[in-house]
C-alpha cells in the first residue's frame, strides 16, 4: 500500500472513467463523479480499466 490516496471517477461529458491523486481531484467539477477512493494503486488501476471495459460493452 502507498501513502498516496487515489480516486477513480466517472467523467460524464466524455463517458469514461479516470483516476487521479485524491488531493488533485476537483470535487466541484460539474461532470466528474467519484466512485472509488483507495491508497492501493493496483486496485484503482484495475477498477478504472474494468469499468471502462463495461462501458464499451454496453455501447455495442
Residue ranges, per PLM feature:
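Short aromatic-glycine-(Arg/Gly/Cys) micro-motifs in beta-strand/loop hairpins
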Residues: 3-33
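A short, charged, amphipathic alpha-helix used as a generic interaction element across diverse proteins
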Residues: 24-60
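Short, Lys/Arg-enriched, disordered terminal segments
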Residues: 1-4, 58-60
